[in-house]
C-alpha cells in the first residue's frame, strides 16, 4: 500500500478513527437497502394484477410496498449495524413475497420486461385517504411529465450513515464554527461532493444493464446497436444503460443542479423548484376537462423527491413531514446511494461482498478532503459518469481529472489504493478481512473487464444464444426456484403475515378516522408547508 498517495487530511482522520478507543465507532455505521423489482408473468409480460393483498397495504407496510406502479414492488430493510444482517433481511423479504406471488415472478434485472402500451401500465394505488390520493396523483403527474415507461426501471438504493459520535470526534480536530448538527450536515454534503467526483467507479464495477428490450424506447431515436435478437438493443462497452441518458431524463430538470456547497443552498434550490412554474406543465394544468387531477401542481417539481439524482442527503421524517422540512429542522442523518443497478445474477440483486465495498467507498468519500465543486468539475463529473455508463469497458477509455485526460484503469487503481486503508480499518473494527477481500475482487474487475457484471450479462446472452428478455426470464426463474425452495421458518412467515395484516388494518383505520378535509384543500396545505420553511 502506498501510504504516500493519501492526503494529509485523510491520514489524520484515519489515524484518529484507528485509535483503540475510537475503532468501535466504525462498527456503529448503519446500512439499509431498498430493492425495486417488477412483477412479471411466467411469459415475461408485466403482471398488471393489483398489488397482492397478502403482502399487506402498500401505504402502511414498512418492508413491502410499491414504487411507481402496482406492478413495481419495493422491498425495504431496516437500517442495521451489520451489513450481513441487512442482506439477510432483504433475502427474507424476498422469500416472504415469493410465498404470496402464485405463478408470478420477480424480474431479475433493472431494465424492464417488454411493457404493454402506456395506458395499460397500472399506477400504484394507495387507497382513499388524502395521503393515499396524493401519492396516486403524484404518480399521475410523473406519467404526464416523463411517461410511465421510464418509471418501470428498477434499482437498488443503499442507505449509509456514520454514528453521530464519529462526526463529533472528527469535529474536535477541525476549526468549524457551527454546532455538532451543522458539522454533521456539512460533512455529509462534503461526502456527496466526493461521491459525485468518484461515483463513475461504482458504475464500472457494478453496472449490470448493458442491454434492454427494444420496445422500451417507444420508437425514440437512439444510438444503440441491435444484436442477439430482433428485440434486443445494447452497447458493446456499456455498463449501465439504466443510468445513461436513455433512462430517466427531464428537460424541466435540466437546469436544476442543486448546489452541494452546503445544506442551505441544496434545500433552497429544491424549494425553489417545487415553487417555480414550468411553462409546459402550466399549459396542461392540474386537472383534465373532467375535473380529475392530473398532477399535483405545475411547477418544475411536484414534490422534492421528483428530483432525480445519484445520491441524496436524507433525514428520517416524522408523520406528515416533508423531506426538506426534516433536513432543515434536524440536518442530514444519512445518505441514499441511488445509482446501483440490480445484479441479475444475484437472487437479491446485491451481495454482501458488494455491500462491504460500498461501505468502504462511501466512507472514503466521507473522510477524504472535499473542496467545493468548481463549475468545470461539475461538468467533468457528469461527463465522466456518462462516459462510464455508456462505454466504461472500452479499451483505453479516458476520463477527465483536473481538466486533464486520465486512463480509467489508472485512476480506478489509484482510488482502490486510497480506499484500501479504509477497508483495513473496517476489518480491524469488525475482526474480519472481508472488506480487504472485496477490494481485491473489485481490483480484479479493473484489471479484467470480462469480470464486470455488465460484461458477464452480455457473455451469458452470447453463450445461451438469447436476447435480453430470454436471459432475464431465465435468471428470474433461477432466483424464483431458489426462494421457493428456501421457505421462511414458520415463525418468520407468521411474523411477516402479521405485519401485512397490521398494515391493512392501519390503512383502514386511517381512512375511517382521518379529519374530513377535501382533497383540494389537503393538496394546498401540502404545497404551502414547503413554502413556509425558513432555514
Curated annotation (Swiss-Prot):
One of its GO terms (cellular component) is cytosol. Its EC number is 6.3.2.2. GO terms for molecular function: ATP binding; glutamate-cysteine ligase activity; metal ion binding. It catalyses: L-cysteine + L-glutamate + ATP = gamma-L-glutamyl-L-cysteine + ADP + phosphate + H(+). Pathway: Sulfur metabolism; glutathione biosynthesis; glutathione from L-cysteine and L-glutamate: step 1/2. InterPro entries: Gln_synth/guanido_kin_cat_dom, Glu_cys_ligase, Glut_cys_ligase. HAMAP family: Glu_cys_ligase. This is Glutamate--cysteine ligase. It comes from Pseudomonas syringae pv. syringae. The gene is gshA.
Amino acid at each position: 500500500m502506498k501510504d504516500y498517495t493519501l492526503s494529509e487530511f485523510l491520514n489524520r482522520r484515519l489515524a484518529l478513527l484507528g485509535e483503540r478507543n475510537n475503532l468501535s465507532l466504525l462498527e456503529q455505521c448503519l446500512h439499509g437497502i431498498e430493492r425495486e423489482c417488477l412483477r412479471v408473468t411466467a411469459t415475461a409480460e408485466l403482471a398488471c394484477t393489483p398489488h397482492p393483498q397478502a403482502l399487506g397495504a402498500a401505504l402502511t407496510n414498512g418492508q413491502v410496498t410499491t414504487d411507481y406502479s402496482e406492478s413495481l414492488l419495493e422491498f425495504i430493510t431496516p437500517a442495521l449495524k451489520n451489513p450481513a444482517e441487512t442482506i439477510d433481511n432483504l433475502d427474507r423479504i424476498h422469500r416472504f413475497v415469493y410465498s404470496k406471488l402464485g405463478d408470478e415472478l420477480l424480474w431479475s434485472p433493472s431494465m424492464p420486461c417488454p411493457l404493454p402500451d402506456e395506458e395499460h401500465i397500472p399506477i400504484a394505488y394507495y387507497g382513499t385517504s388524502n395521503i393515499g390520493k396524493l401519492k396516486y396523483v403524484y404518480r399521475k403527474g410523473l406519467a404526464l411529465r416523463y411517461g410511465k415507461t421510464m418509471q418501470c426501471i428498477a434499482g437498488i438504493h443503499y442507505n449509509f450513515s456514520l454514528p453521530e459520535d464519529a462526526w463529533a470526534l472528527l469535529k474536535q480536530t477541525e476549526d468549524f464554527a457551527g454546532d455538532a448538527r451543522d458539522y454533521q450536515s456539512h460533512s455529509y454534503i462534503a461526502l456527496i461532493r466526493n461521491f459525485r467526483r468518484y461515483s463513475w467507479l461504482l458504475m464500472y464495477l457494478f453496472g449490470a444493464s448493458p442491454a434492454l428490450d427494444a420496445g422500451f424506447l417507444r420508437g425514440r431515436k437512439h444510438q444503440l446497436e441491435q444484436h442477439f435478437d430482433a428485440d434486443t438493443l445494447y452497447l458493446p462497452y456499456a455498463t449501465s444503460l439504466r443510468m445513461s441518458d436513455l433512462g430517466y431524463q427531464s428537460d424541466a430538470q435540466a437546469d436544476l443542479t442543486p448546489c452541494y456547497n452546503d445544506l442551505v443552498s441544496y434545500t433552497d434550490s429544491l424549494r425553489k423548484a417545487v415553487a417555480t412554474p414550468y411553462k409546459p406543465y402550466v399549459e396542461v394544468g392540474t386537472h383534465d376537462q373532467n375535473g380529475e387531477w392530473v398532477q399535483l401542481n405545475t411547477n418544475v417539481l411536484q414534490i422534492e423527491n421528483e428530483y432525480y439524482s445519484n445520491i441524496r442527503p436524507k433525514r428520517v421524517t416524522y408523520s406528515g413531514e416533508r423531506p426538506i422540512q426534516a433536513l432543515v429542522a434536524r440536518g442530514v442523518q444519512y445518505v441514499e446511494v441511488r445509482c446501483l443497478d440490480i445484479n441479475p445474477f444475484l437472487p437479491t440483486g446485491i451481495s454482501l461482498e458488494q455491500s462491504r465495498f460500498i461501505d468502504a467507498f462511501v466512507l472514503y468519500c466521507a473522510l477524504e478532503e472535499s473542496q467545493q465543486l468548481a463549475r468545470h468539475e461539475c461538468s467533468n463529473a457528469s461527463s465522466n459518469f456518462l462516459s462510464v455508463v455508456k462505454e466504461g469497458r472500452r479499451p483505453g477509455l479516458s476520463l477527465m481529472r483536473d481538466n486533464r485526460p486520465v486512463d480509467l484503469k489508472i485512476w480506478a487503481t489509484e482510488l482502490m489504493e486510497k480506499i484500501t486503508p479504509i477497508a483495513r480499518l473496517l476489518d480491524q473494527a469488525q475482526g474480519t478481512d472481508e472488506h480487504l477481500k472485496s477490494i481485491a475482487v473489485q481490483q480484479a474487475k479493473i484489471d479484467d473487464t470480462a469480470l464486470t457484471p455488465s460484461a458477464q450479462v452480455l457473455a451469458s446472452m452470447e453463450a445461451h444464444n438469447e436476447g435480453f428478455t430470454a436471459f432475464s426470464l431465465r435468471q428470474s426463474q433461477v432466483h424464483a426456484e431458489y426462494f421457493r425452495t428456501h421457505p421462511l421458518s414458520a415463525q418468520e412467515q407468521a411474523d411477516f403475515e402479521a405485519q401485512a395484516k397490521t398494515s391493512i388494518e392501519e390503512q383502514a383505520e386511517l381512512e375511517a378516522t382521518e379529519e374530513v378535509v377535501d382533497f383540494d384543500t389537503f393538496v394546498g396545505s401540502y404545497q404551502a408547508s414547503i413554502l413556509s420553511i425558513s432555514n
